[in-house]
């Protein structure tokens, strides 16, 4: 219930602060008016009968203004500091009470199931935040791997395949999904989808474990692909597309594949809808979920998306001649400026994919069951992001961030802060601000390898998102110093050597490779959270590892502690 009231609480905060600002502006105007009138009166009195009486009147007015300003300062403090803290404390208290009630001895004695979909009290206030200051970020190290039971099932035959994990975590619970193919990993005709939800609990050793409370296996003949998942109040929401042909054929077509939203609640209610967002048909040749997780934001569920835009459509024309070159390129690329600009502009268009413009964006859906025409597509401006690719959305406090897979020519981790504009209660536009970094590279072939630093056309890379440990907005220049953690494939051209790391804008601070040299791997997802009891920060690194026994890949969750050295 608390999670469901989050949008209302956020709206009340905005209304309260807006009213406060209007009140303060009125007070300021009145104060200026009173001061102006008092000066005129003072002049008149001094010219007529001296200044004794006017000084008394002016002193009275000054005292009145001081009282007004004192009240105004108290209002500012209450609205900006005290009220948000009280709301956070109240939320934590309510969640703790609900957790305690649903696991009480009385319920257990009455044979009631005591498992609530709420994380342990130690973690509720330690989720979706920045965990270290800028100074602390310079001295972080990775702890050893912690042994926990895996909440991710693997293939059970040598021919089976589990791929494309997506994981989402909020204060209350987590949601997870991956694709299951019965024979090999290359299949655009038939697959199933595994979904689970659960909570974080402490082990007797003191570190966290992930307890699964509900699972769902979608095996109904619908070939859902590239699914992106998000936690929502009381359950999970998932965005998938239905694949019926190879990826290249999707881009060459003129109508996008079927788009689906699935809502799964903890009480076993399942709602699935085929969605038709306005502005997609006849504009997008194909539209795919970003595979990385989405977020629940102000009553809307936001998912990363990307696809191919048809030539001469309104979106195509609006993005014409737009390009983005990351800040770090200037000092690292030997091309002259004109060549960089020309190559950067052409990098958004793929001849392999029928000369479509490869575009990134956000799918925004209200949290309701009738979603057929309610979801919206919000494209990023291509002078703020690179060529369209898989991605992930994050919540850090009240801020939304975006990871974009480095499919294009710049091989480094691409993170952005996202601003969402609302019009008449609906998200209407998005903008992105890049966190400048020259770490951490992904592998690629030819001119698109991990060593490339100059603009050009690339369609390479691998999904490897990262978690920000420090706030990029904490520096005078946005993102000039930021620390983040994740996993990457430590090779220039091959998908090998999975390595967990902590890095900043310019260097890798700490790293640990998993397995022997040459170990094959693929996608990597990273999420961090804090145990507010011990104040320790943990990160879960979900990595696709190649397997010679069961399936081509096994999806494995690794947990490490991030510590100050």
UniProtKB/Swiss-Prot annotation:
Topological domains annotated Virion surface: 42-565
InterPro entries: Hemagglutn-neuramid, Hemagglutn/HN, Sialidase_sf
Cysteine-cysteine disulfides: 161-185, 175-236, 227-240, 333-454, 365-375, 448-458, 528-539
Top-level class of the enzyme under EC nomenclature: hydrolase
Record localization: Virion membrane; Host cell membrane
Membrane topology: Single-pass type II membrane protein
Keywords from the named record: Disulfide bond, Glycoprotein, Hemagglutinin, Host cell membrane, Host membrane, Host-virus interaction, Hydrolase, Membrane, Signal-anchor, Transmembrane, Transmembrane helix, Viral attachment to host cell, Viral envelope protein, Virion, Virus entry into host cell
Region (Involved in neuraminidase activity): 223-228
Pfam families in UniProt: HN (PF00423)
GO MF annotations, alphabetized: exo-alpha-sialidase activity; host cell surface receptor binding
Highest taxon of the lineage: Viruses
Glycosylation: residue positions: 110, 139, 267, 504
Intravirion-side positions: 1-20
Catalysed transformations (reactions): Hydrolysis of alpha-(2->3)-, alpha-(2->6)-, alpha-(2->8)- glycosidic linkages of terminal sialic acid residues in oligosaccharides, glycoproteins, glycolipids, colominic acid and synthetic substrates
Transmembrane segments: 21-41
Record-listed E.C. numbers: 3.2.1.18
Keyword Transferase carried by entry: no
GO cellular component entries: host cell plasma membrane; membrane; viral envelope; virion membrane
GO process annotations (BP): symbiont entry into host cell; virion attachment to host cell
Family: Belongs to the paramyxoviruses hemagglutinin-neuraminidase family.
Purpose: Attaches the virus to sialic acid-containing cell receptors and thereby initiating infection. Binding of HN protein to the receptor induces a conformational change that allows the F protein to trigger virion/cell membranes fusion.
Subunit structure: Homotetramer; composed of disulfide-linked homodimers. Interacts with F protein trimer.
Domain notes: The C-terminus (head domain) is involved in binding the cellular receptor.
Protein name (Swiss-Prot/TrEMBL): Hemagglutinin-neuraminidase
Organism: Parainfluenza virus 5 (isolate Canine/CPI+) (PIV5)
């Amino acid at each position: 219930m608390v999670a469901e009231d989050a949008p209302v609480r956020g709206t009340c905060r905005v209304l309260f602060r807006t009213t406060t600002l209007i009140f303060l502006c009125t007070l300021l105007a009145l104060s200026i008016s009173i001061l102006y009138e008092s000066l005129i009166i003072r002049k008149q009195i001094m010219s007529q009968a001296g200044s004794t009486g006017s000084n008394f009147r002016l002193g009275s007015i000054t005292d009145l203004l001081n009282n007004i300003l004192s009240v105004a300062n108290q209002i500012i403090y209450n609205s900006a500091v005290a009220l948000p803290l009280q709301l956070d404390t109240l939320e934590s208290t309510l969640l703790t009470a609900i957790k305690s009630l649903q696991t009480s001895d009385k319920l257990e004695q009455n044979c009631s199931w005591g498992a609530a979909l709420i994380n342990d009290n130690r973690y509720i206030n330690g989720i979706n935040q920045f965990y270290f200051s800028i100074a602390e970020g310079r001295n972080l190290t990775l702890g050893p791997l912690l042994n926990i039971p895996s909440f991710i099932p693997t293939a059970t035959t040598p021919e089976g395949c589990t791929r494309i994990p997506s994981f989402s975590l909020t204060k209350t619970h987590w949601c997870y999904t991956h694709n299951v193919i019965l024979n090999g990993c290359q299949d655009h005709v038939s697959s199933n989808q595994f979904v689970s939800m659960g909570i974080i609990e402490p082990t007797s050793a003191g570190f966290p474990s992930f307890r699964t409370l509900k699972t769902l296996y979608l095996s109904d003949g619908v070939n859902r692909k590239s699914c992106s998942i998000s936690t929502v109040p009381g359950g999970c929401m998932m965005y998938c597309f239905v694949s019926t042909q190879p990826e290249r054929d999707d881009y060459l077509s003129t109508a996008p594949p079927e788009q689906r939203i699935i809502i799964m609640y903890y009480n076993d209610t399942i709602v699935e809808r085929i969605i038709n967002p306005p502005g997609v048909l006849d504009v997008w040749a194909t539209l795919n979920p970003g595979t990385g997780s989405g977020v629940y934001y102000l009553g809307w569920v936001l998912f990363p998306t990307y696809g191919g835009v048809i030539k001469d459509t309104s979106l195509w024309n609006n993005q014409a001649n737009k390009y983005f070159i990351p800040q770090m390129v200037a000092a690292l690329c030997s091309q002259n400026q004109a060549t960089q600009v020309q190559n950067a502009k052409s990098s958004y268009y793929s001849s392999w994919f029928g000369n479509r413009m490869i575009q990134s964006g956000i799918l925004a859906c209200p949290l309701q069951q009738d979603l057929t025409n309610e979801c919206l597509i919000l494209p990023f401006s291509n002078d703020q992001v690179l060529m369209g690719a898989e991605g992930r959305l994050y919540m850090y406090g009240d801020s939304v961030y975006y990871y974009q897979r480095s499919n294009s020519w710049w091989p480094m981790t691409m993170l952005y802060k996202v601003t969402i504009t609302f019009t008449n209660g609906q998200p209407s536009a998005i903008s992105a601000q890049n966190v400048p970094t020259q770490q951490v590279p992904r592998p690629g072939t030819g001119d698109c390898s991990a060593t490339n630093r100059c603009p050009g056309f690339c369609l390479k890379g691998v999904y490897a998102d990262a978690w920000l440990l420090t706030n990029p907005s904490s520096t005078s220049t946005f993102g000039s110093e930021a620390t983040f953690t994740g996993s990457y494939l430590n090779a220039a051209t091959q998908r090998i050597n999975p390595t967990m790391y902590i890095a900043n804008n310019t260097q890798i601070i700490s790293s640990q490779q998993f397995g022997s040299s040459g170990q094959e791997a693929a996608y990597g997802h990273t999420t961090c959270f804090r145990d507010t009891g011990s104040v320790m920060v943990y990160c879960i690194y979900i990595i696709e590892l190649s397997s010679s026994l069961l399936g081509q890949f096994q999806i494995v969750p690794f947990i490490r502690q991030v510590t100050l050295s």
